[in-house]
Amino acid sequence: MVSVQIIVRPITSPNSSSGQTMFHWNNIREEQFSRLIPSWKSCKVCQVGFSGKLVAMLDRIITFLREEAVLCIAFAFACASLAVSGDVVQAPAYIDWRVIALLFCLMASVAGMRVSGILARVAQVLVSGDRTKRLVCFTLVAMPFFASMLVTNDVALIAFVPVATLALESAGWQDDLVRVAVLQAVAANLGGMVTPVGNPQNLFIFTTYELTTADFAAALLPFGCLAFVLLALACLTFSHEHASVSLAVDENAIDMRRFALHAALFALSVLAVMRVIAYPIVLLIVAAALFVFDRRIFAEIDYALLATFACFFVFSGNMANMPAMQELLGGLMGDHPMLTSLISSQVISNVPATVLLSGFTQNWHSLLIGVDLGGLGTPIASLASLIAFRLYMHTRGARAASFVKEFAIVNTLMLAAMVVLYAALFVRW
């Protein structure tokens, strides 16, 4: 970090010190400043016409583009499709507002339960004490697997990857964090696929195709069972050594009333997903409850994900009206829907792939399995995997190469096993 002082002298009087204007930039990263002014180190007087606020703004823009790359890509695709179609007025009609509203309600209630501290308390009870490494690692992997069925895969990882870090460090097993974090990412993706609210693409498909809970469970429960067995077997690779695991939780930070409020809102949201209660009513109840009792949660909602969905709805709607895309994607989804969904997820992530491909098929079964299994594979196949990687990289001694290597091995083996099961169950030889 460097502290930079820039003297801007009037061009008409370069030797006059009375006309100097002083700008002080403190704590500007040297590499950031070097990108703006490559020769600043050798320049005694920098004649520049911008202030520190501009640098800070540019830094925020770069950070946003990096952290919300999927949203930016979705927005670019939506704008490009509108430019080609020329039908800007029709754009809002392409957006499935029911899905957006339900996502908002679920994210709000889940965020409230997470902030209440209950998940951390549950983790403390399950992990702390005299434990074997194998049992601790299995518990750390099982928690996001089951939690993701209710609180979505990304929230499960946000809650339990830091728990894994603290638990393993307290026992001196931090070298095993890479494998545990990778297995947690896989567990969250595969556990979340079992329920309609386990991940965003499930909610979208369940809502769009008006599925029953029985149909949904029948399609994915076999894969969930196999996933749990494979994750349990993977945990056998950890040793059987003992250690005392200590996981401290601030008891004062646990808010049971907040948890009760958001658990009730979550139950209402699930009823709206199941079409028991009209979603506009639940949306009003959730928004009013947050405004009156817990306004902080408004800041915890992933608005970027909501905007990403809206952009891909617009993009998908425009693509569906283009004859060339109808022929291409319609043909692929007609001949190989599961494989097309799986491969598309590897390239553009499974949530965008779901929204895009849904406009070209009524075969919800193959689409659902394809995008859920498509969460395995490349790091960008599922946003939850990127969350796990980002959380891991914030730990001490994090090794990106080790994570990517472990991720590639585990995901390849898991995906291969899931594809074999799919072939055994649904492919007619």
Name each region found by the language model.
Residues 217-228, 339-429:
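C-terminal transmembrane helix pair
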Residues 97-99, 128-141, 170-180, 256-260, ...:
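Membrane-interfacial loop-to-helix junctions in multi-pass transporters
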Residues 94, 116, 120-123, 265-362:
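Transmembrane helical segments that form the transport core of multi-pass membrane transport proteins
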Residues 124, 237-263, 295-299:
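Flexible interhelical linker loops that connect adjacent transmembrane helices
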Residues 58-84, 96-108, 259-268, 276-291, ...:
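Hydrophobic mid-bilayer segments of alpha-helices in multi-pass membrane transport proteins
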Residues 61-66, 89-99, 213-223, 252-254, ...:
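Interfacial loop-to-helix junctions that mark the boundaries of transmembrane helices
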Residues 140-142, 146-190, 355-369, 423-427:
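Hydrophobic transmembrane alpha-helices that form the pore/transport pathway of multi-pass ion
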Residues 172-240, 245-250, 367, 389-418:
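Membrane-core helix-loop-helix motifs of multi-pass transport proteins
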